[in-house]
Structure formats: structure tokens, C-alpha cells
């Protein structure tokens, strides 16, 4: 889908833009972000959103099916976007259940740090830049490298 980001979790698809696709293709739900911060008027399905602080997670947790917390590590694709949390803050948030199975780690996730995500108590990891860097949509035609890398990450996270 051109101009749309998709998140796949447990073989279910959430659209981050073009919310009409949710109904048209019976997708799992929609994801709210700064560009699309409100759900459609009569929408009643699965909703997730991105948060940028632990307080925001705590305040929004009861209103959404799950949340992304970002940036956990320095962003791979956006220069100057650095980690918003210390390891101790994340450990403590996991112990106090602010971070739990409904909170997904986003930002700078790579094979070097994906195992830490489990230790902090996150329900999963959102991998973007690390995968994007494995494939150039303008020049590459062979998806095998990005598929291999995804499988490697998935195996590490399982």
C-alpha cells in the first residue's frame, strides 16, 4: 500500500493510515498517531496508539487495546531522535506493570537489543528502521534478505 504503514502482530493487520482499509479488508483495527490522532466518527473496533512517555502510557492504557512506547532506543531512520528512557526507568516500569503485554517497544529495535525488550516486560517489539535498511524499494527486487532478517528477529523474540 503506497503511503501507508502496516503493523503485523500475530498475523493480524492494523492500518496506521487510510482507516477505510480496516473495514474494506476486515483488518484487525487502526493505529492512532500524531498524523491521525482521532478514530473515525462511528468506529468501534480495535484501536492502538503511540505514546512517548511512561505517564502517557499509564494515562491512555485503559482506553486502547494496546500501546506503542517510543523511542526505546535511538531511532535508526530519523536523525536526532534519541532514546527517551533509561534502562532503569524501563525496568521499574515493567516491575510496576506500566509496561506489560499490551505495551509494544518502538524505536531503534535491532538484533542487538531485541532480547532486552522481553526483560523490560514489553508485550512485543515494533521493528521498522532495522528492516527498512535491509531493502531499497526503488532498486531492490529480491525480498529474500529482508524476509531472512525478519525471520531472524522473530526467532529471537519468540
Regions found by a protein language model. Name each.
Residues 31-58:
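S-adenosyl-L-methionine/SAH cofactor-binding core of RNA-modifying enzymes
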Residues 1-8:
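Short, small-residue-biased leader/transition segments that mark boundaries at the very start
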Residues 47, 53-78:
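Histidine/lysine/aspartate-rich catalytic loop segments that bind and position anionic ligands
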Residues 158:
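Expand to "…catalyze enediolate/carbanion chemistry for C-C bond making/breaking, isomerization
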Residues 8-9, 43, 99:
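Helix C-cap/helix->beta junction micro-motif
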Residues 81-91:
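Charged helix-capping and loop-helix junction motifs
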Residues 13-28, 52-63, 96-99, 104, ...:
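Catalytic cores of alpha/beta
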Residues 32-40, 68-81, 114-153:
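Glycine-rich phosphate-binding active-site loops on the catalytic face of alpha/beta enzymes
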Amino acid at each position: 500500500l503506497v503511503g501507508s504503514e502496516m503493523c503485523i502482530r500475530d498475523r493480524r493487520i492494523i492500518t496506521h493510515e487510510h482507516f477505510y482499509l480496516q473495514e474494506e479488508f476486515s483488518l484487525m483495527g487502526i493505529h492512532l498517531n500524531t498524523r491521525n490522532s482521532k478514530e473515525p466518527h462511528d468506529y468501534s473496533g480495535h484501536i492502538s496508539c503511540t505514546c512517548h512517555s511512561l505517564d502517557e502510557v499509564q494515562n491512555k492504557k485503559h482506553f486502547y487495546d494496546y500501546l506503542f512506547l517510543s523511542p526505546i532506543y535511538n531511532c535508526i531512520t530519523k536523525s536526532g531522535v534519541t532514546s527517551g528512557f533509561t534502562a532503569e526507568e524501563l525496568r521499574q516500569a515493567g516491575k510496576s506493570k506500566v509496561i506489560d503485554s499490551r505495551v509494544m517497544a518502538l524505536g531503534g529495535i535491532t538484533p542487538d537489543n531485541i532480547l532486552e525488550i522481553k526483560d523490560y516486560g514489553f508485550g512485543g517489539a515494533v521493528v521498522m528502521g532495522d528492516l527498512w535498511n535491509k531493502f531499497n524499494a526503488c532498486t531492490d527486487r529480491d525480498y529474500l534478505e529482508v524476509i531472512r532478517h525478519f525471520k531472524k528477529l522473530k526467532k529471537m523474540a519468540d
